[in-house]
Amino acid sequence: MMPPNEQESSFPKTPSANRHETSPVQENRFSSPSHVNPCLDDDNDHDGPSHQSRQSSVLRQSLRPIILKFEELTYSIKSQTGKGSYWFGSQEPKPNRLVLKCVSGIVKPGELLAMLGPSGSGKTTLVTALAGRLQGKLSGTVSYNGEPFTSSVKRKTGFVTQDDVLYPHLTVMETLTYTALLRLPKELTRKEKLEQVEMVVSDLGLTRCCNSVIGGGLIRGISGGERKRVSIGQEMLVNPSLLLLDEPTSGLDSTTAARIVATLRSLARGGRTVVTTIHQPSSRLYRMFDKVLVLSEGCPIYSGDSGRVMEYFGSIGYQPGSSFVNPADFVLDLANGITSDTKQYDQIETNGRLDRLEEQNSVKQSLISSYKKNLYPPLKEEVSRTFPQDQTNARLRKKAITNRWPTSWWMQFSVLLKRGLKERSHESFSGLRIFMVMSVSLLSGLLWWHSRVAHLQDQVGLLFFFSIFWGFFPLFNAIFTFPQERPMLIKERSSGIYRLSSYYIARTVGDLPMELILPTIFVTITYWMGGLKPSLTTFIMTLMIVLYNVLVAQGVGLALGAILMDAKKAATLSSVLMLVFLLAGGYYIQHIPGFIAWLKYVSFSHYCYKLLVGVQYTWDEVYECGSGLHCSVMDYEGIKNLRIGNMMWDVLALAVMLLLYRVLAYLALRNL
């Protein structure tokens, strides 16, 4: 069948009329603490009507209806050229590929809009653009109550990605509690924030699993549907006016998917604007949508009331093959260019595939043309119309400029520190890590058992081992920090939850117990077993130098991980870097050629080694350098070439490295 001729449809030109008349300011079911979660302690119960009204007023104040408009959105990405094309000049760079092509729409408070389309049609790109998180240049306009995307709009917007980015070792209650402490306004007390967590847990049906860990990977935890509800709950805690979700039912069974969509519908009925992408909804799910936007290769072919989609396509000549067809399946077939009388795939021979593709492309072009003729003019008129929210939003936006962050810097730091310690408690002092450090320390102590100054080369080797081992170990632990945290950091910073500085300092401070206690145990065991100078002062100074070296090495690892954001690449570069520091440290090679001698001045192991030797030996100390001969320790070739003098310069050099590498890591994170 050839596509119907493009004709003026008798379909009414107001397809966006909502079949559910819902006031955008209905009472918010999350605004009154009517549900109590038994998972929390009795101390967190509410205190009475005055307390309830105060909390309710703050949360109701935060729920400001948002009318979302987007007009003629166009977005393109660069097409990658085949390998070798630039080397041999056989191919020219491919033109940019259009992902979105003149997409328009409007969603009002109380409405649930579903974006439908086959894979690669641009659904995720569109919802990401509407959430203000799309990288690159987007042409067209997106407005929120007539204003562009601002920090105040960001704080009123919830965005749930397709992949649930959650900490696997935290429980459901802990996850939502930390989110509430970070995202809810500082006008609420801690007790009131915990009560908001109770209500969200109860209303999303998470009471049964509130004390279960999230899980993920090899960690057994809650189900996929429960994980998705936790992700939605994180956004619902802030009582968003606009909620956007990317395929929230992906990978879920039909019952769980229906429960998720029913939750979204009830949230929309509370006066919110809800937009979601969905891949292949059942007829039961489809009936829950107020509006649908159907995309085909980035172009809209329908935008309007979900209950009138069959009527519209029938009016332009496209009828389903059966009267009992799922509307979602029907429109997805049309988006792929497949009509009811298109030949079945198994009936098409190889030589007929080209004709089939041409027919499908013809159907798509016909649908796009019909949309532009019949649906786009009234939609454009509605998008251009001014609503009351557009007139009042400027005043609210000016007021919100002074409150960019929901909580203070110290509150963000303390909550992030507690959350980080809780999440990483399983690895901070894991049995495997303790076993490794204890094994190496005991083995080192036995190998250097009660060494004497007479065996000066052995003692100097032990000091160099201190600097190298506690350079490698913290560096390789640190390079995985930010690559592993990257998805969570991007998600939370995109939502404007906290300052990067509070996260960065909390993350580095939280690692200090793990990074400093283990080397302290190591040095304590190895120092006394190895027969180094039996002086408490010298021991403490040796320990301080090793810990200083650990902090510098950790900074190098953090910088490499933050800059590369690829653990494998960072580990490879770290191996090469530490090998250079090892060779240029001053132990293996005392006479480095002048043209490459500068390497030792960028090696933190070199400065650590010099400091360890400097505090271990004095100028008047001697050792047995031959039969009956005693020589000054400082005249020993391996020590003499270190040129030990004023050790404050070495301390200063390490301080510069300590500061420089951590600043580099911070700047790299700002560019995420």
UniProtKB/Swiss-Prot annotation:
Residues 411-617 form the ABC transmembrane type-2 domain. ATP binds at G117, P118, S119, G120, S121, G122, K123, T124. It is found in: Membrane. InterPro entries: AAA+_ATPase, ABC2_TM, ABC_transporter-like_ATP-bd, ABC_transporter-like_CS, ABCG_dom, ABCG_transporters, P-loop_NTPase. The keyword S-adenosyl-L-methionine does not apply. Residues 50-59 have a biased composition (Low complexity). The chain crosses the membrane at residues 429-449, 460-480, 512-532, 543-563, 576-596, 649-669. Belongs to the ABC transporter superfamily. ABCG family. Eye pigment precursor importer (TC 3.A.1.204) subfamily. This is ABC transporter G family member 21. The gene is ABCG21.
